[in-house]
Amino acid sequence: LGDVYKRQVNSLFEVKDRDALSTAYTPGVAEPCRQIKANPDDVYKYTFKGRTVAVVTNGTAVLGLGNIGPEAGLPVMEGKCVLFKEFGGVDAFPICLNASTREEVIAAVKAIAPTFGGINLEDIRSPECFDIEAELERDLDIPVFHDDQHGTAIIVLAGVLNALKVVGKRLEDVKIVQNGPGAAGTAIIKMLQVAGAKNIVAVDEHGILYPGRPAGLADHKEWLATVTNPERLTGTLADAVRGADVFIGTSVAGALTTEMAATMAPDAIVFAMANPNPEIMPDAAKAAGVRAVSYTHLRAHETLRHLV
């Protein structure tokens, strides 16, 4: 897998002789240290802080693989760093924390924050991720962004709006089922509601979310139960998707069966985004009568699996 390795660190300063070395390191570095001490904002002038981002995880919710730990999450963080550099020109560094609690993650990020111009939180399980982002946003003086929530929600909203144009439906009129209301799913629901969606049904592994559900609800799901499901449906995912115009999955592979998809409304739309394998394959969805399908792309994943 040597050729798959995604990162290296290169110097922008050529150390060609002893004078250059003494400028890059001691004693030359003493002067910018003095300047920054006198004016802390000069750290953006004299260091790489302003163009660097920390991509931080604790490995508790990596892709659809679950709690696989910080080491196993490192390839994902490296990949995200590639995206920052290739598409944004921003230098990013993967930070994989051996920290299982929200307090440990928050303390670790606060401790390393002086080095970076921004924090990208990644693959941290819910509901801890909500509190972690909120506290870091409140206490740090640099941007904090939880990609699983907000990045995913932005892209899904754009995709749903365009898919609805294709099938000739309006966001405010359609029934949307969101399966897997974790970090990404919750943010997607919030974004869709702000955009005008009025009938969203959230479903987790225990079934449809509604107030007072016997299976119980985590704090964020308790809130979701009050702001979604206006018809107060109960039951399973199969019950939720019956007559639905849009299915949005951020759950697990195979969650949406062909039989379920066949009960959706005419010209249905499916976003099968379980990672790395989708809730339903596109051929199966199309065979069930679904009009538009967006799904997790498998080709690179399968190629890498063969390399391993």
Please identify what each model-predicted range represents.
Residues 241, 256-281:
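Accessory "access/gating" subregions that flank catalytic or transport cores
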Residues 71-75, 154-241:
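Glycine-rich phosphate/diphosphate-binding loop of Rossmann-like nucleotide-binding domains
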Residues 274-298:
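Rossmann-fold NAD(P)-binding glycine/threonine-rich loop
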Residues 2-8, 296-303:
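Conserved small/polar residues in nucleotide/adenosyl-binding loops
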Residues 103, 221-262:
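A structured beta-alpha segment of the ubiquitous adenosine-cofactor-binding alpha/beta core
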Residues 3-142:
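N-terminal ligand-binding/catalytic initiation module
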Residues 94, 120-123, 144-147, 178, ...:
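General beta-strand structural signal in soluble alpha/beta enzymes
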